[in-house]
From Swiss-Prot:
GO MF assignments: rRNA binding; structural constituent of ribosome
Protein name as annotated: Large ribosomal subunit protein uL15
Superkingdom field: Bacteria
Gene that encodes the chain: rplO
Organism for this UniProt entry: Buchnera aphidicola subsp. Acyrthosiphon pisum (strain APS)
GO BP terms: translation
Description of how the protein assembles with itself and partners: Part of the 50S ribosomal subunit.
Length: 144
């Protein structure tokens, strides 16, 4: 067997249907579009979700939820990230300077993930319950 002798199996390939080529073809005259109506016209397409003038489903159902603009300026910080810092007093500006969070972040929350090895003083940051207890157990404290 050679690549130049390969051919598709019988019936595997179909020739495309030629539209508008006589009654005997099965697709003559109206070319499979039926008679009249919007879908029979050239250049016509019915928009997605259109239900023939009936109020469409996406407008019958109520709106819900919203996208909070705060989510783009809020982030989480792991305890394990804080133990590698050069300073022991940590606030939002320190996290930005050390490139732990991006410059546009306005709110950061410290979460319990990993172990804390050095005592830290946290100022002006949100802290989860688990992270708070871990910070206090290592001799640090949470202010504000």
């Amino acid at each position: 067997m050679r690549l130049n002798t390969l051919s598709p199996a019988n019936g595997a390939r179909h020739s495309r249907k030629r539209l508008g080529r006589g009654i005997g073809s099965g697709f003559g005259k109206t070319s499979g579009r039926g008679h009249k109506g919007q879908k029979s016209r050239s250049g016509s397409s019915i928009r997605r979700g259109f239900e023939g003038g009936q109020m469409p489903l996406y407008r019958r159902l109520p709106k819900f939820g919203f996208n909070s603009r705060k989510k783009n300026i809020t982030t989480e910080v792991r305890l394990s990230d804080l133990s590698n810092l050069s300073t022991n007093i940590i606030d939002l500006n320190v996290l930005k300077q050390e490139n732990i969070i991006k410059k546009n972040i306005k709110y950061a929350k410290i979460i319990l993930s990993g172990k804390l090895t050095v005592p830290l003083i946290i100022r002006g940051l949100l802290v989860s319950k688990g992270a708070r207890s871990e910070i206090e157990n290592t001799g640090g404290k949470v202010e504000g």
